[in-house]
A protein has these predicted regions:
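Beta-strand-rich recognition/accessory modules
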Residues: 14, 77, 156-159
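Active-site/ligand-binding surface loops and adjacent short beta/alpha elements
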Residues: 111, 119-159
Length: 159
């Protein structure tokens, strides 16, 4: 059974599969990252904000692979002002899949956040249970406040 949506001829890297969101997940307000008292401008991939990191647009190298496991590696790209790299290990089990992301800073400390953006095939009947999510502000940016949800909108940050 196919679980994740696969790409079509007009799809972008952001509309299918289960891509890693690294070195940031979700939206970065106005694409501005402030770290160590320095402001950095990121590309506005979801105007007027930066979204979903840089790794999805990078070419990945296969480090190791078997019939049920693969380990991939890439740098964080020129659009990430701090350098660094990420490895992604995917392992298929009998009844689940293990996903692991490891982010490594370059020569200096850096902020980092990871997540995955799955696009699931919609079965004829769906049952999802989420207890809480990060509340969004008026611009659609996740805050640090957890709120209860009725899960009617599943394009969110659930905890």
């Amino acid at each position: 059974m196919e679980v994740l949506l696969t790409s079509g001829p007009n799809d972008t890297a952001l509309t299918w599969g289960c891509y890693p969101m690294v070195p940031y997940a979700g939206r970065v307000r106005s694409g501005v990252v402030r770290f160590d008292n320095v402001e950095h401008q990121l590309p506005l991939t979801l105007p007027p904000h930066a979204a979903h990191g840089t790794a999805f647009a990078q070419s990945w190298n296969v480090v190791d692979a078997s019939a049920s496991r693969i380990e991939l590696f890439t740098d964080l790209g020129s659009h990430w002002p701090f350098g660094g790299s990420v490895s992604h290990r995917i392992e298929l089990k009998d009844d689940h899949v293990n996903l692991e992301l490891r982010v490594t800073a370059g020569d200096h400390a850096m902020p980092a956040q990871v997540g995955w953006h799955p696009w699931f095939c919609k079965p004829s009947r769906t049952s999802l249970i989420f207890e809480s999510m990060l509340q969004r502000d008026e611009h659609g940016i996740a805050t640090s406040r957890c709120v209860q949800t009725d899960a009617t909108n599943v394009d969110d940050c659930f905890v």
